[in-house]
């Protein structure tokens, strides 16, 4: 299941803002970049709901897997975790999250991937 549109990050200005103004959290399998939201950047994308809600993006390079099927499977696993574990009450947090996966074989070890993802979510204080 994909992220709802109001939880997605889009546009190169948004990603440039995150790269410049983020706090980084490193794990063995992935890196989190968390930045305070800046809704003015989203106004250029004609978002009617450009509020300070929590938004996320998951970037998976070809170094992780050459097959798009595998990369999409990993992305769906992480997006599903976000949808089920970020309740509507928590969506008001004014943060943007960019998840970058480091190279490795994640297709066989879903539990390890989700455990690391959850640990970094706690470490970044996006969930309690």
From Swiss-Prot:
InterPro entries referenced in this protein's UniProt entry, alphabetically: Ribosomal_Su5_D2-typ_SF, Ribsml_uS5_D2-typ_fold_subgr, RNase_P
Record keyword RNA-binding present: yes
GO molecular function annotations of the record: 3'-tRNA processing endoribonuclease activity; ribonuclease P activity; tRNA binding
Signal peptide coordinates: none
Database matches in Pfam families: Ribonuclease_P (PF00825)
GO CC terms in record: ribonuclease P complex
Any one of the GO BP annotations: tRNA 5'-leader removal
EC number, as in UniProt: 3.1.26.5
Catalytic reactions of this protein: Endonucleolytic cleavage of RNA, removing 5'-extranucleotides from tRNA precursor
Domain of life, source organism: Bacteria
Keywords, sorted A to Z: Endonuclease, Hydrolase, Nuclease, RNA-binding, tRNA processing
Family to which the UniProt record says this protein belongs: Belongs to the RnpA family.
SUBUNIT field: Consists of a catalytic RNA component (M1 or rnpB) and a protein subunit.
Function per UniProt: RNaseP catalyzes the removal of the 5'-leader sequence from pre-tRNA to produce the mature 5'-terminus. It can also cleave other RNA substrates such as 4.5S RNA. The protein component plays an auxiliary but essential role in vivo by binding to the 5'-leader sequence and broadening the substrate specificity of the ribozyme.
Protein name: Ribonuclease P protein component
Protein species of origin: Prochlorococcus marinus (strain MIT 9312)
Primary gene name: rnpA
